[in-house]
Amino acid sequence: MSLDTAEKQKLIETHQVHATDTGSVEVQVAMLSKRISKLSEHLQGNIHDFASRQGLLKMIGKRKRLLSYIKDKNVQKYQDLVKKIGIRG
């Protein structure tokens, strides 16, 4: 489940670090989180879509690694990002 251009642009604008930022870790995590939520909704109705389930697990792993990187570099940024995106309880 991909994101359309308008959704990507909105995510970039809300999570960018500076004016021309499109690929910072914060933006990547936000995009992955949105894709994960869309794919999770898809899998609720299509329980036998194993290829999509595999893709979902890969995306979750990538997001976990990116969040770990942010946490190692700056704990305050990590906490703000987790709160802003609404993940991890």
Curated annotation (Swiss-Prot):
Species of provenance: Prochlorococcus marinus (strain MIT 9312)
UniProt-listed GO biological process terms: translation
Encoding gene, per UniProt annotation: rpsO
PROSITE patterns linked: RIBOSOMAL_S15 (PS00362)
Keyword Acyltransferase carried by entry: no
Subunit comment: Part of the 30S ribosomal subunit. Forms a bridge to the 50S subunit in the 70S ribosome, contacting the 23S rRNA.
Function noted in UniProt: One of the primary rRNA binding proteins, it binds directly to 16S rRNA where it helps nucleate assembly of the platform of the 30S subunit by binding and bridging several RNA helices of the 16S rRNA. Forms an intersubunit bridge (bridge B4) with the 23S rRNA of the 50S subunit in the ribosome.
Record's keyword annotation contains Membrane: no
Keywords assigned: Ribonucleoprotein, Ribosomal protein, RNA-binding, rRNA-binding
Protein name, entry field: Small ribosomal subunit protein uS15
Record-stated family: Belongs to the universal ribosomal protein uS15 family.
GO cellular component: cytosolic small ribosomal subunit
GO molecular function: rRNA binding; structural constituent of ribosome
Transmembrane segments: none
InterPro entries, per database record: Ribosomal_uS15, Ribosomal_uS15_bac-type, uS15_NS1_RNA-bd_sf
